[in-house]
Amino acid sequence: MLERHHDVLAPTLLGHAGGPPLQGEVSEALIPDAVERAMDDAGFETAHIVGNSLGGYIALQLAARGRAESVVALAPAGGWAKGDESFKETLGFFATMQDQLRAAAPHAEAIMASAEGRRRATQFIATNFEHIPAELLAHLMCGVVGCEVAPMVEYATREGYQLDAAKVTCPVRIVWGTDDKLLPWPSAAARFRDDWLPQADWVELEGIGHCPQLDVPLESAQLIVGFTAR
């Protein structure tokens, strides 16, 4: 659906499976720098930028750099209230989850062949799984295992998340599922709502999980296209 309205560039983030490896010391600028290079290589000076979780946080960082015409952030990371240390527990869970999936990944296709396997595989990211192809879920499982989680988690745990919100001057829509088990609504959005981006267009998706693009793909696409068309 998005391709009918926009030229789509979908770069894989540094340190994520299928993307360039992390090189050098991890820093706040490392991943946004790489996305900017991908935009430059593709000829995009600015773009309507969409991201989920860490990708949503990166989208907002790119907006602060003046690279976004608009941003749609789906449950962006980094929104815990100042002083809320629970984000460290969340980051630790990502590392633990990767360890658990590493043992299961060689059997990904067999796991996803059953409805129960697909339900368990999506329990932290989506509330609706029946429509998601088994092949995609197997690919996602192997993708999680292929991420360089440890150095990114170590950096974020130590340094936290920052956003120069005053420099985010483009329109921003933030979409959050009320049944998000990884970044729970509304606590994981507190700093975005109260300090950084209270003026954003906020959309709550009742009963939806952490990855709306998997949970309700058509509605997610409509929320993106409807916002970029303004």
PLM region spans:
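Structural signature of beta-strand start/N-cap positions in the alpha/beta core
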Residues: 7, 45-48, 69-70, 171-173, ...
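Active-site loop/oxyanion-hole signature of alpha/beta-hydrolase fold enzymes
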Residues: 7-54, 61, 86, 222
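Alpha/beta-hydrolase active-site loop signature
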Residues: 13-17, 78, 209-212
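Short glycine-enriched nucleophile-adjacent loop
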Residues: 56-66, 71
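Flexible "cap/lid" loop of the alpha/beta hydrolase fold
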Residues: 68-105
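Conserved alpha/beta-hydrolase catalytic His-Asp/Glu region
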Residues: 106-167
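Conserved loop-alpha-helix segment in the C-terminal half of the alpha/beta-hydrolase fold
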Residues: 166-208
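Catalytic histidine-centered segment of alpha/beta-hydrolase-like enzymes
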Residues: 208-221
